């Protein structure tokens, strides 16, 4: 284990808890990395960078992979860029600032692994926008699809939580 990366991860976990920044936790973290391993990714696309925690995990696990990660919030984007520089990953983890709907049009594929971690209501639209840029055997992971058990519930799901 790299002590610099371990310290960065711990720092981000504390920061996320303090500032209420959603980051992947516990069992979901293991599921994400297991799903990505199935793709043996050379290129990864993450939609929803936040402060860069998931990108850091993916860059650490896949040291040869190029990663494009998209974030709409300028403060979180700046923090993610800072994290990638501190980790020594800024040459292969590219943090893009802007709305995913616009940024997806500018990206070049193919991507072997897609991680949807932005607004749940946009997942289908984002998937359709990037579908042609995925490699034939790409693996797709979507965070929060079981958000608060709503997928399993018989109750109507509020629009903003639909995927």
Report residues per predicted region:
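Rossmann-like AdoMet
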Residues: 1-24, 37-38
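SAM cofactor-binding core of SAM-dependent methyltransferases
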Residues: 21-104
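Short internal loop-to-helix segment that lines adenine-nucleotide cofactor pockets
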Residues: 99-106, 125-129
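Switch II (G3) loop of P-loop NTPases
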Residues: 118-120
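C-terminal substrate-binding/active-site "lid" region of AdoMet-derived donor-dependent transferases
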Residues: 122-163
